[in-house]
Amino acid sequence: MDPSAYLPAVYPVNDYGPVMKGLAIGGLGIFHVFLAQFAIGGGFLMWWFEWLGITGREPLADRLVGSVFRVLILLSFVVGALTGVGMWLTSIQVSPQTIGLMVDEFHWIWATEWIFFWLEVVAGYAFFRYRDHLAPRARLALLAIYSVAGWGSLFWINGILSWQLTPGAWTETHSVWDGFFNPTFWPSLLFRTVVCLVLAGLGAAIVINAMPGLSREERTRLINRCSLFLLPMLAMPVLGGWFVMAMPADSRSWIMGGSMTMTMFLNIAAGASALIGGYAVIGLWRQRLYINGATATLLAALAFGATAGGEFVREGVRKPYSVRETLYSNATTPAQIASLRETGVTVHDPYPLRDRADYPSEQLALGRLVYRNQCAICHTVSGTNGLTELMGGWSLGQQRMNVAKLQWTKGFMPPFAGTPGELEAVVQYIRWEHAKRPADWAESRDPAVLAEIARWLEEAGTAPAPRAQELAREEVSR
């Protein structure tokens, strides 16, 4: 084994203050995913309406395609592109180890995806610029290229993202294709494809209501045509169930009540989707109702809520990993845990504290460094998901034991990676912060306390939560 495997990679420090780092990238990511999926589905919707216009089935098709594409250009090619760049920027700041591993393993997949994205942008701008000068068949072909390229971009990205949860045989072979075509690849891809179509139908309904010069009957006819893009929602329960059953057993347990937060967000996503699907099937398709702009916008807002809930669940069920069995959510690897419990995690951190003078003792400064290396990716001190609130109700003994046995305390947490002295330092630091940072704070270096912490660390071990291991063994035995 390469000795460097036991040393953590250290990157420059970024601090978002009271905003949790994961929340910063998560919020931006949800917005970007929502826009990107609308753009992909919008391509197929425009191609279909262009075909309806060419074949004489819909006299207003040309107007609708032009209106939808103007919105698509603004949202996808401008806002979507900006948020896409923002995703890369925040990713390399929040979890550079994770994004670095993804690029190392799938650099040719990323390169292929960028080619598809480039093709999508070129085809889209060519259609926007030369649409009025092209023959109908040429416009149809250009929209087909745009649609297929957009979906192709989703195809490649989906493989990388689903690999984080279910790397499959990649953990043994490290083959790109074993990692890419992983157990959740197909259910995830098909589910996202349905979402793309649904968002396109809802977005088009909003655009139709904003188009001037249309009669009520014309708007109703166009909206009813767009409602066909919502019918694939009928497959969502099957695809969602397929995805859930393809998850590792411990990940599945988080959304089945093991984690109240993840279960709640799953219910939000499922509930919002059910409301949209019910309205689409019964109201728009069966009864062929007209919906005004306010109702269409409300349905789109529900779709955004469903997207947010689904993306939160997708991120959350990977816990305690960022890449399953390879990289923990706090950017340490399973191979590093035992080593760091001997050497300490802070000895590898070359960056000094910018506010060192604010800490009354060396122990508190050390605790801040431990927090920065072990906790800051997913927690703040006193803000969102703040440790002072999460640990404030525990006694001092409980704080020490619960952090030492972290993966037992919360099954979705990684094992603590550090020495007993570092663990005591971070506990004292959180207590000091909870006490509103007093000017004086006694150091805690009782050998008996450190020995007890060492015993707890030994009892907890360096593996994930016992329940997770038990579920994994049961799954293998089946």
Predicted regions and their residues:
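Polytopic transmembrane helical bundles with strong interfacial aromatic enrichment
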Residues: 1-350
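Alpha-helix capping/termination and helix-coil
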Residues: 211-214, 374-382
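Sequence context surrounding c-type heme c attachment/ligation sites in exported
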Residues: 314, 318-339, 361-376, 384-398, ...
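Electrostatic cytochrome c docking/interface patches
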Residues: 339-370, 472-477
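Extracytoplasmic/periplasm-facing segments of secreted or lipoprotein envelope proteins
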Residues: 359-361, 368-374, 455-465
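Extracytoplasmic electron-transfer domains, predominantly the class I c-type cytochrome c fold
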Residues: 377, 382-442, 458-464
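C-terminal partner/receptor-binding element of secreted or periplasmic proteins
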Residues: 446-450
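Short, low-complexity, Pro/Ser/Thr/Gly-rich segments in the mature regions of secreted, periplasmic
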Residues: 451-477
